[in-house]
From Swiss-Prot:
This is Inactive serine/threonine-protein kinase ZRK12. GO terms for biological process: cell surface receptor signaling pathway; defense response; regulation of immune response; response to temperature stimulus. Induction: Induced by elevated temperature (e.g. at 25 degrees Celsius). Together with RPP13L4/ZAR1, involved in the regulation of the ambient temperature-sensitive intersection of growth and immune response in the absence of pathogens. The modification Phosphothreonine is found at residue 214. Keywords: ATP-binding, Nucleotide-binding, Phosphoprotein, Plant defense, Receptor. Disruption phenotype: Slightly shortened inflorescence stem when grown at 25 degrees Celsius. The double mutant zed1-6 zrk12-1 exhibits short inflorescence stem and autoimmunity symptoms when grown at 25 degrees Celsius.
Length: 389
């Protein structure tokens, strides 16, 4: 009686069909030119992960409902990370292949999770990444202020690379803090390019049919009309910066609920906005936080002109270097030119401590005036137009 049942395709045929789809995405994204990646067989994956054994499960990374992460090793790598999707529904319209294609293009950059290879023989998509001693999901509440700033800079640098390193800009479009991993050194790494899209040459945007991402992080014209541009990522970075600064509880209190007091509306204070998990805030950190918040508001279009992602990354570097850490040195892996920044750093390092202190005082005074005006208008705006999620 089972004659009517649909016959399952052999694994080799499934892998062949998927390989053709992957090749199509590789050609579309990078003309077939990308960093070398390896095709793993199902047997190789099982052997590397002890057949997806419980002892190999990376609990720190496996809290979401989309993937399970496993540690492993093979003859070529002492440590690998294997990401296995729960079901193919996670990858809407074969976005698994887009993830592989874009990951292979950017895996040489320090702020992206490095892809080693993939396996097309399982029913669920499997990707293999370079492993380090420790990878863990970003929990902003556990991070000190200095680390939060560095995380924001890492992500802005990664997205600036996506926007500028290739003949056509690539837009990540579904950024959220859950797509960011930290390694043992606290370096932020972006992953999962399933919904990444490229902007055609000569164009500034592209329109998509499927809206992907977390609502709070989505620019209004993308959420309503499916318009994707570089500013889609800039908006998401601005929102991420606000989350890093305020923490989830404070952000929810400000954005989603009636404001606690009229005094808070008329005289907004940084210590009422900053995440209390960060503990005591110094004067230097207060100045940084104000500059950080103002930059985030530019990213989300609430203050001044929306910056490019390259400008966001540069400003985040400046906020850290000039107001806090005189020894900060730009990364050689950034796509933009840092010569001027390096020169400024050398000049500043040759000045006296008194001069630096004076500059900080002037900067703080300017930020105080600007901050008070901006915050009052920002809170009033959200009081009238609270977003419905």
């Amino acid at each position: 009686m089972g004659w009517w049942r649909k016959k399952k395709k052999p694994k080799s045929e499934i892998a062949s069909e998927r390989g053709a789809k992957l090749l199509k995405d590789l050609i579309e994204c990078c003309d077939g030119k990308s960093n070398p990646i390896k095709f793993f067989s199902a047997d190789e994956i099982r052997k590397a992960t002890n057949n997806f054994g419980v002892s190999n499960l990376v609990s720190e990374l496996s809290h979401d409902f989309d993937y399970k992460w496993y540690s492993g090793k093979n003859e070529n790598h002492d440590m690998i990370l294997v990401r296995k999707a729960f079901s193919q529904s996670v990858y809407y319209k074969d976005t698994f292949f887009r993830d592989i294609a874009v990951s292979s293009m950017v895996s040489g950059h320090k702020n992206f999770l490095k892809l080693i290879g993939y396996c097309l023989e399982f029913e669920e998509p499997v990707m293999v990444y370079h492993g380090v001693k420790k990878h863990y999901h970003l929990e902003s509440s556990e991070q000190p202020w200095k680390r939060r700033m560095k995380i924001a800079e890492d992500i802005a640098t990664a997205l600036a690379y996506l926007h500028t390193a290739f003949p056509r800009p690539f837009v990540y479009r579904c950024l959220s803090l859950t797509n960011i991993l930290l390694d043992e050194d606290g370096v932020a790494k972006l992953m999962d390019f399933s919904f990444c899209v490229s902007i055609p040459e000569g164009e500034t945007f592209v329109q998509v049919d499927y809206i992907a991402g977390t609502v709070d992080y989505l620019k209004p014209n993308y959420l309503k009309h499916g318009v994707v541009s570089e500013e889609t990522d800039v908006f998401a970075v601005g929102h991420s910066m606000q989350m890093l600064l305020m923490g989830e509880k404070i952000f929810d209190r400000i954005m989603r609920r009636p404001f606690p007091t009229s005094k808070f509306m008329e005289e907004p204070k940084m210590d009422e906005i900053a995440d209390p998990e960060m503990g005591e805030i110094s004067e230097e950190e207060l100045c940084q936080m104000k500059a950080f918040l103002l930059l985030s508001l530019r990213c989300t279009g609430h203050v001044g002109e929306v910056p490019t992602m390259v400008e966001v990354a540069k400003e985040l570097k400046s906020i850290q270097r000039c107001l806090h850490n005189d020894t900060f040195s730009p990364s050689v892996e950034t796509q933009f030119d840092s010569h001027q920044d390096i020169s400024s750093s050398v000049i500043l390092s040759n000045q006296t401590k008194d001069t630096r202190a004076l500059l900080r005082c002037i900067a703080c005074h300017v930020f105080d005036e600007m901050f008070q005006w901006v915050m009052m208008n920002w809170f009033r705006f959200f009081r009238r137009n609270r977003r419905i999620c």
